[in-house]
Amino acid sequence: MFDYQAPAELLKDRIILVTGANRGIGAALAKGCAALGASVILQGRDAAALDQVCQEILASGGQAETLVLDLERADAAAYAAVAERLRQRHGRLDGLVHNAGLLGPRVLLEETPAAALAQVLQVNVQAGFALTQALLPLLRAAGEASLIFTSSSVGRKGRGGWGAYSVSKFATEGLMQVWAEELAEDGIRVNSVNPGGTRTAMRAAAYPEEDPARVPAAEAILPVYLYLLGPASRGTTGQALNAQ
């Protein structure tokens, strides 16, 4: 596991948006950030699931709000509306974690329908690009914001049978590297995290015969995310990190 011990008030008063925060890694990270003092914005398309995570955070004394947005169907107007809402409510954004993702069909590229590739690229790449672009003024306003893209081992070394998902994660790594160079002078650090095998619904779909008890829970892989969101990672940008 990534070796980092987060101080008690690491993210005090920071505004952090986590996509795909209704379950899995996103939900665990949102709760972890709130426990360390952050005001967390939980994005997802399942309003009921988001509200449940939000209520758990509020019940434990944390600060959170929900942002219902379907990344598969969102257009420029929707992203602009999100940016305006956050500008009015917070005026800045200290952290943006692109966690939401779509697995798509685990088949050979030869067998991958073009529509399936387009759908996976929309959620895993285009949405991250469009949301980042819309929120750049708020990230700049924070002074030293952190932007995190979720990658995968199959986005760093191609593997047959991972089809559209692997292609999308290679694109994610490229997006991270370009943003890192372009935003360096703005003090915005941009990195990617490969969570590794984690006990999530996506993992279960990819490995249906695997015993989930043999892979780490989402809470176990949070240290790398917390490190990147906190001040200890100042100067760390353009890096492809592993959670475990």
Region locations from a protein language model:
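Conserved glycine-rich cofactor-binding loop
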Residues: 20-23
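Rossmann-fold cofactor-recognition segment
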Residues: 59-75
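Substrate-binding pocket helix/loop in short-chain dehydrogenase/reductase
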Residues: 82, 107-109, 113-118
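Active-site helix of classical SDR
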Residues: 132, 168
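Alpha-helical segment proximal to the catalytic Tyr-Lys
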Residues: 137, 180-182
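Residue(s) in the substrate-gating loop at a strand-loop-helix junction
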Residues: 152
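C-terminal helical subdomain
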Residues: 185-188, 192, 200, 209-244
